[in-house]
Protein backbone atom coordinates (compact mmCIF):
# COMPACT_ATOMS: atom_id res chain seq x y z
CA UNK A 1 0.00 0.00 0.00
CA UNK A 2 1.23 3.46 -0.89
CA UNK A 3 0.95 5.81 2.09
CA UNK A 4 -0.52 9.25 1.42
CA UNK A 5 -0.54 11.92 4.12
CA UNK A 6 -3.68 13.93 3.44
CA UNK A 7 -4.56 17.25 5.08
CA UNK A 8 -8.11 18.56 5.47
CA UNK A 9 -7.87 22.30 5.93
CA UNK A 10 -10.65 22.25 8.55
CA UNK A 11 -13.61 20.07 9.52
CA UNK A 12 -16.63 21.12 7.47
CA UNK A 13 -19.78 19.41 6.26
CA UNK A 14 -19.39 20.68 2.72
CA UNK A 15 -16.32 18.43 2.44
CA UNK A 16 -18.67 15.43 2.53
CA UNK A 17 -17.46 13.95 -0.81
CA UNK A 18 -13.94 13.61 0.58
CA UNK A 19 -15.11 12.07 3.87
CA UNK A 20 -17.34 9.65 1.98
CA UNK A 21 -14.42 8.61 -0.22
CA UNK A 22 -12.46 7.76 2.93
CA UNK A 23 -15.32 5.77 4.42
CA UNK A 24 -16.29 3.84 1.31
CA UNK A 25 -12.90 2.21 0.87
CA UNK A 26 -12.17 3.75 -2.49
CA UNK A 27 -8.57 4.55 -1.65
CA UNK A 28 -7.77 1.00 -0.59
CA UNK A 29 -9.05 -0.22 -3.96
CA UNK A 30 -6.38 1.99 -5.50
CA UNK A 31 -3.65 0.63 -3.23
CA UNK A 32 -3.53 3.80 -1.14
CA UNK A 33 -3.21 4.00 2.63
CA UNK A 34 -4.56 7.50 3.28
CA UNK A 35 -3.74 9.08 6.64
CA UNK A 36 -5.97 12.07 7.37
CA UNK A 37 -4.77 14.99 9.49
CA UNK A 38 -5.31 18.72 9.93
CA UNK A 39 -2.84 21.61 9.80
CA UNK A 40 -2.42 23.75 12.90
CA UNK A 41 -4.76 26.23 11.21
CA UNK A 42 -6.44 26.70 7.82
CA UNK A 43 -3.79 29.26 6.88
CA UNK A 44 -1.15 26.50 7.18
CA UNK A 45 -2.84 24.15 4.71
CA UNK A 46 -0.61 25.15 1.79
CA UNK A 47 2.67 25.78 3.61
CA UNK A 48 2.50 22.43 5.43
CA UNK A 49 2.94 20.73 2.05
CA UNK A 50 6.36 22.31 1.67
CA UNK A 51 7.30 21.79 5.31
CA UNK A 52 6.88 18.01 5.07
CA UNK A 53 3.71 17.60 7.15
CA UNK A 54 1.48 16.40 4.30
CA UNK A 55 1.64 15.17 0.72
CA UNK A 56 -1.74 16.35 -0.52
CA UNK A 57 -4.33 18.78 0.85
CA UNK A 58 -7.98 19.28 0.12
CA UNK A 59 -9.08 22.85 0.48
CA UNK A 60 -9.85 26.01 -1.38
CA UNK A 61 -7.96 27.15 -4.46
CA UNK A 62 -7.83 30.42 -2.51
CA UNK A 63 -4.90 29.00 -0.50
CA UNK A 64 -3.09 28.01 -3.69
CA UNK A 65 -3.56 31.46 -5.17
CA UNK A 66 -2.48 33.09 -1.91
CA UNK A 67 0.67 30.97 -1.84
CA UNK A 68 1.51 31.75 -5.46
CA UNK A 69 0.87 35.43 -4.83
CA UNK A 70 3.48 35.34 -2.06
CA UNK A 71 5.89 32.81 -3.59
CA UNK A 72 5.59 32.68 -7.39
CA UNK A 73 8.70 30.54 -7.96
CA UNK A 74 7.86 27.96 -10.68
CA UNK A 75 9.33 25.01 -8.75
CA UNK A 76 7.19 25.84 -5.69
CA UNK A 77 3.85 25.93 -7.47
CA UNK A 78 0.81 24.18 -6.05
CA UNK A 79 -1.27 22.19 -8.50
CA UNK A 80 -5.00 21.44 -8.21
CA UNK A 81 -6.18 18.20 -9.76
CA UNK A 82 -9.54 16.95 -8.41
CA UNK A 83 -12.41 19.21 -7.36
CA UNK A 84 -15.33 18.12 -5.18
CA UNK A 85 -16.99 21.40 -4.12
CA UNK A 86 -17.85 23.36 -7.25
CA UNK A 87 -20.13 26.04 -5.76
CA UNK A 88 -20.00 28.34 -2.77
CA UNK A 89 -21.54 26.53 0.26
CA UNK A 90 -22.20 29.65 2.35
CA UNK A 91 -25.63 31.13 3.01
CA UNK A 92 -27.01 34.42 4.27
CA UNK A 93 -29.48 33.60 7.05
CA UNK A 94 -31.71 36.42 8.24
CA UNK A 95 -33.86 36.93 11.32
CA UNK A 96 -37.11 37.15 9.34
CA UNK A 97 -38.41 35.86 6.00
CA UNK A 98 -37.32 37.83 2.96
CA UNK A 99 -38.37 35.91 -0.13
CA UNK A 100 -37.69 38.86 -2.43
CA UNK A 101 -34.15 39.44 -1.12
CA UNK A 102 -31.87 41.75 -3.07
CA UNK A 103 -28.28 42.64 -2.24
CA UNK A 104 -29.40 46.24 -1.87
CA UNK A 105 -31.34 45.14 1.24
CA UNK A 106 -28.02 44.69 3.05
CA UNK A 107 -27.53 48.47 3.12
CA UNK A 108 -30.17 48.58 5.87
CA UNK A 109 -28.96 45.55 7.82
CA UNK A 110 -26.31 44.65 10.33
CA UNK A 111 -24.45 41.76 8.70
CA UNK A 112 -22.12 39.35 10.52
CA UNK A 113 -19.68 37.68 8.13
CA UNK A 114 -17.36 34.71 8.46
CA UNK A 115 -14.11 35.44 10.31
CA UNK A 116 -12.57 31.96 10.33
CA UNK A 117 -11.53 31.97 6.65
CA UNK A 118 -11.45 34.75 4.02
CA UNK A 119 -13.10 33.14 0.98
CA UNK A 120 -16.78 33.54 2.00
CA UNK A 121 -16.51 37.31 2.40
CA UNK A 122 -14.27 37.68 -0.66
CA UNK A 123 -16.92 36.00 -2.80
CA UNK A 124 -19.80 37.94 -1.24
CA UNK A 125 -18.09 41.30 -1.64
CA UNK A 126 -17.64 40.48 -5.34
CA UNK A 127 -21.37 39.73 -5.55
CA UNK A 128 -22.04 43.14 -4.01
CA UNK A 129 -19.73 44.93 -6.44
CA UNK A 130 -21.47 43.26 -9.37
CA UNK A 131 -24.77 44.50 -7.96
CA UNK A 132 -23.41 48.06 -7.90
CA UNK A 133 -22.88 48.16 -4.13
CA UNK A 134 -19.70 49.31 -2.39
CA UNK A 135 -18.92 46.58 0.19
CA UNK A 136 -17.55 49.29 2.47
CA UNK A 137 -21.07 50.69 2.87
CA UNK A 138 -22.31 47.57 4.65
CA UNK A 139 -22.61 47.64 8.45
CA UNK A 140 -20.58 44.50 9.08
CA UNK A 141 -19.45 42.48 12.12
CA UNK A 142 -16.13 40.93 11.13
CA UNK A 143 -14.49 39.52 14.26
CA UNK A 144 -16.85 36.81 15.55
CA UNK A 145 -17.01 33.09 14.85
CA UNK A 146 -19.94 31.54 13.02
CA UNK A 147 -21.12 30.04 16.29
CA UNK A 148 -21.03 33.45 17.98
CA UNK A 149 -22.81 35.02 15.03
CA UNK A 150 -25.54 32.37 15.19
CA UNK A 151 -26.07 33.28 18.85
CA UNK A 152 -26.15 36.97 17.92
CA UNK A 153 -28.90 36.25 15.38
CA UNK A 154 -30.88 34.36 18.02
CA UNK A 155 -30.48 37.28 20.42
CA UNK A 156 -31.45 39.92 17.85
CA UNK A 157 -28.03 41.61 17.88
CA UNK A 158 -27.63 41.27 14.10
CA UNK A 159 -30.09 41.08 11.22
CA UNK A 160 -28.35 38.55 9.00
CA UNK A 161 -25.35 36.23 9.22
CA UNK A 162 -23.11 34.41 6.76
CA UNK A 163 -22.74 30.73 7.70
CA UNK A 164 -22.41 27.25 6.26
CA UNK A 165 -24.25 24.05 7.10
CA UNK A 166 -25.17 22.78 9.66
CA UNK A 167 -25.71 26.27 11.15
CA UNK A 168 -28.29 26.97 8.45
CA UNK A 169 -30.33 23.86 9.16
CA UNK A 170 -30.15 24.32 12.94
CA UNK A 171 -31.37 27.92 12.77
CA UNK A 172 -34.20 26.97 10.42
CA UNK A 173 -35.24 24.08 12.67
CA UNK A 174 -35.28 26.44 15.66
CA UNK A 175 -37.54 28.83 13.77
CA UNK A 176 -35.16 31.76 14.21
CA UNK A 177 -33.40 31.70 10.84
CA UNK A 178 -34.55 32.20 7.27
CA UNK A 179 -32.51 31.72 4.10
CA UNK A 180 -32.07 35.01 2.26
CA UNK A 181 -29.33 34.10 -0.20
CA UNK A 182 -27.53 30.87 -1.02
CA UNK A 183 -24.19 31.77 -2.59
CA UNK A 184 -24.31 28.59 -4.67
CA UNK A 185 -26.97 30.29 -6.77
CA UNK A 186 -24.35 32.56 -8.36
CA UNK A 187 -23.08 29.56 -10.33
CA UNK A 188 -19.73 27.82 -10.45
CA UNK A 189 -17.18 29.09 -7.93
CA UNK A 190 -14.31 26.70 -7.36
CA UNK A 191 -14.34 26.00 -3.63
CA UNK A 192 -12.57 22.76 -2.73
CA UNK A 193 -10.06 20.63 -4.57
CA UNK A 194 -7.18 18.28 -3.99
CA UNK A 195 -3.87 20.05 -4.50
CA UNK A 196 -0.19 19.22 -4.04
CA UNK A 197 3.26 20.69 -4.78
CA UNK A 198 4.29 20.45 -8.42
CA UNK A 199 7.24 18.23 -7.45
CA UNK A 200 4.89 15.67 -5.84
CA UNK A 201 2.56 15.80 -8.83
CA UNK A 202 5.42 15.01 -11.19
CA UNK A 203 6.76 12.15 -9.08
CA UNK A 204 3.45 10.63 -7.93
CA UNK A 205 1.09 10.85 -10.89
CA UNK A 206 -0.21 7.33 -10.20
CA UNK A 207 -1.06 8.40 -6.65
CA UNK A 208 -2.99 11.41 -7.93
CA UNK A 209 -4.85 9.19 -10.37
CA UNK A 210 -5.77 6.82 -7.52
CA UNK A 211 -7.07 9.62 -5.32
CA UNK A 212 -9.08 10.99 -8.22
CA UNK A 213 -10.57 7.61 -9.13
CA UNK A 214 -11.71 7.15 -5.54
CA UNK A 215 -13.26 10.62 -5.53
CA UNK A 216 -14.99 10.13 -8.88
CA UNK A 217 -16.56 6.84 -7.76
CA UNK A 218 -17.72 8.60 -4.62
CA UNK A 219 -19.20 11.50 -6.59
CA UNK A 220 -21.20 9.06 -8.70
CA UNK A 221 -22.47 7.31 -5.57
CA UNK A 222 -23.20 10.63 -3.83
CA UNK A 223 -25.57 11.79 -6.55
CA UNK A 224 -27.44 8.48 -6.53
CA UNK A 225 -27.66 7.81 -2.78
CA UNK A 226 -30.29 9.18 -0.40
CA UNK A 227 -29.45 12.00 2.00
CA UNK A 228 -29.94 9.62 4.93
CA UNK A 229 -27.48 7.13 3.41
CA UNK A 230 -24.91 9.86 2.89
CA UNK A 231 -25.46 11.12 6.44
CA UNK A 232 -24.91 7.64 7.87
CA UNK A 233 -21.68 7.34 5.88
CA UNK A 234 -20.10 10.55 7.18
CA UNK A 235 -21.70 10.78 10.63
CA UNK A 236 -18.49 9.76 12.43
CA UNK A 237 -16.95 13.07 11.32
CA UNK A 238 -19.83 15.02 12.89
CA UNK A 239 -20.83 13.07 16.02
CA UNK A 240 -22.29 16.19 17.65
CA UNK A 241 -25.02 16.52 15.01
CA UNK A 242 -28.41 14.86 15.28
CA UNK A 243 -29.57 12.73 12.36
CA UNK A 244 -32.32 15.20 11.30
CA UNK A 245 -29.92 18.16 11.23
CA UNK A 246 -27.22 16.22 9.37
CA UNK A 247 -29.65 14.80 6.81
CA UNK A 248 -31.32 18.17 6.32
CA UNK A 249 -27.99 19.92 5.79
CA UNK A 250 -26.88 17.31 3.25
CA UNK A 251 -30.22 17.53 1.43
CA UNK A 252 -29.85 21.32 1.30
CA UNK A 253 -26.39 21.12 -0.24
CA UNK A 254 -27.59 18.57 -2.78
CA UNK A 255 -30.46 20.85 -3.77
CA UNK A 256 -28.01 23.72 -4.22
CA UNK A 257 -25.72 21.55 -6.42
CA UNK A 258 -22.75 22.43 -4.22
CA UNK A 259 -21.02 19.12 -5.00
CA UNK A 260 -19.72 18.48 -8.49
CA UNK A 261 -20.63 15.35 -10.42
CA UNK A 262 -17.08 14.75 -11.59
CA UNK A 263 -13.57 15.81 -10.49
CA UNK A 264 -12.90 18.38 -13.20
CA UNK A 265 -12.09 21.86 -11.93
CA UNK A 266 -13.89 24.13 -14.37
CA UNK A 267 -12.06 27.19 -15.60
CA UNK A 268 -15.26 29.21 -15.17
CA UNK A 269 -15.39 28.48 -11.44
CA UNK A 270 -11.68 29.14 -11.01
CA UNK A 271 -11.93 32.52 -12.71
CA UNK A 272 -14.94 33.57 -10.63
CA UNK A 273 -13.03 32.81 -7.43
CA UNK A 274 -9.86 34.51 -8.62
CA UNK A 275 -11.73 37.66 -9.66
CA UNK A 276 -13.27 37.85 -6.18
CA UNK A 277 -9.87 37.53 -4.49
CA UNK A 278 -8.42 40.24 -6.72
CA UNK A 279 -11.33 42.67 -6.31
CA UNK A 280 -11.20 42.13 -2.54
CA UNK A 281 -7.48 42.96 -2.56
CA UNK A 282 -6.64 39.54 -1.10
CA UNK A 283 -4.18 38.81 -3.91
CA UNK A 284 -2.41 40.99 -6.46
CA UNK A 285 -1.03 38.40 -8.86
CA UNK A 286 -3.33 37.24 -11.65
CA UNK A 287 -2.20 33.61 -11.72
CA UNK A 288 -3.39 31.85 -14.90
CA UNK A 289 -5.52 28.72 -14.63
CA UNK A 290 -2.89 26.80 -16.58
CA UNK A 291 -0.22 27.55 -13.95
CA UNK A 292 -2.03 25.93 -11.05
CA UNK A 293 -4.60 23.45 -12.39
CA UNK A 294 -3.78 20.13 -14.08
CA UNK A 295 -7.02 18.98 -15.73
CA UNK A 296 -5.33 15.95 -17.29
CA UNK A 297 -5.68 13.89 -14.09
CA UNK A 298 -9.47 14.18 -13.93
CA UNK A 299 -9.77 13.84 -17.69
CA UNK A 300 -7.74 10.62 -17.69
CA UNK A 301 -9.86 9.13 -14.90
CA UNK A 302 -13.11 10.07 -16.59
CA UNK A 303 -11.91 8.60 -19.88
CA UNK A 304 -11.48 5.20 -18.19
CA UNK A 305 -15.25 4.73 -17.91
Predicted feature residues:
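Pocket-lining segment of extracytoplasmic ligand-binding domains
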Residues: 96, 148, 152-238
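Short amphipathic alpha-helical segments at helix boundaries and their inter-helical linkers
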Residues: 54, 58, 154, 253-267, ...
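Conserved C-terminal helix/tail region of periplasmic/extracytoplasmic solute-binding proteins
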Residues: 275-305
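Short, glycine-/small- and polar/acidic-enriched structural segments
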Residues: 2-133, 140-143, 159-165, 176-181, ...
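Predominant activation on well-ordered alpha-helical scaffold segments within soluble catalytic domains
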Residues: 19, 62-65, 125, 169-172, ...
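Short secondary-structure boundary/hinge segments and terminal tails
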Residues: 39, 45, 67, 146, ...
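Secondary-structure end/capping motifs
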Residues: 204-284
Amino acid sequence: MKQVRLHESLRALFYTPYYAALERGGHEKEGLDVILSQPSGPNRAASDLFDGYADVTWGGPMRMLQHMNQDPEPDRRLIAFAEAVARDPFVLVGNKPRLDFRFDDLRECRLATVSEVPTPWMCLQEDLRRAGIDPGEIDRVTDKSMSENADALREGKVDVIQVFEPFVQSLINEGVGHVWYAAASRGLTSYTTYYAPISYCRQERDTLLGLTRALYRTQTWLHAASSSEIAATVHKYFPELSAPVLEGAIAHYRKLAVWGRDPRLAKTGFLRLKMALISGDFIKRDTPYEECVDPSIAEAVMAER
